[in-house]
From Swiss-Prot:
It comes from Albidiferax ferrireducens (strain ATCC BAA-621 / DSM 15236 / T118). Its cofactor is iron-sulfur cluster. GO terms for molecular function: 2 iron, 2 sulfur cluster binding; 4 iron, 4 sulfur cluster binding; iron ion binding. Belongs to the HesB/IscA family. Keywords: Iron, Iron-sulfur, Metal-binding. Homodimer. This is Putative iron-sulfur cluster insertion protein ErpA. The keyword Iron applies. GO terms for biological process: iron-sulfur cluster assembly. Required for insertion of 4Fe-4S clusters. The gene is erpA. InterPro entries: FeS_biogenesis, FeS_cluster_insertion, FeS_cluster_insertion_CS, FeS_cluster_insertion_RrpA, HesB-like_dom_sf. The keyword Transport does not apply. Binds 1 iron-sulfur cluster per subunit. Pfam families: Fe-S_biosyn.
Length: 120
């Protein structure tokens, strides 16, 4: 009698939520630049009124320590240091009466400033 081990593969949820709205806006911006190799890099750096601040830039290069996520054909890059601060976060794009901007909702942030781009 032979035993067959059944392997069940489950897809783990992404530790960072990159919304459809954010992916669509990034796709529009990449199309405007005319460079399909661009990826959105999201990072955390020291600064801002609460100690850390979020940053966004386009990058063509994926570094060895980057975590890469893809949503609707758009790639998001996060370096290893920033990743630890962004686990569980939602990266969204909002348009309202106050303007249009990328927004990060981060459950790891204990305090945030009024501008929403700085946290501790």
């Amino acid at each position: 009698m032979s035993a067959v081990a059944e392997t069940i593969q489950t897809e783990m949820p992404s530790p960072i939520l990159f919304t459809d709205s954010a992916a669509a806006k990034v796709a529009d911006l990449i199309a405007e630049e005319g460079n399909p190799d661009l990826k959105l890099r999201v990072f955390v750096q020291g600064g801002g009124c609460s100690g850390f601040q979020y940053g966004f830039t386009f990058d063509e290069i994926t570094n060895e320590d980057d975590t890469t996520m893809t949503k609707n054909g758009v790639s998001l890059l996060i370096d290893a240091m920033s990743y630890q601060y962004l686990v569980g976060a939602e990266i969204d794009y909002k348009e309202d009466l106050e303007g249009a901007q990328f927004v990060i909702k981060n459950p790891n942030a204990t305090t945030t400033c009024g501008c929403g781009s700085s946290f501790s």
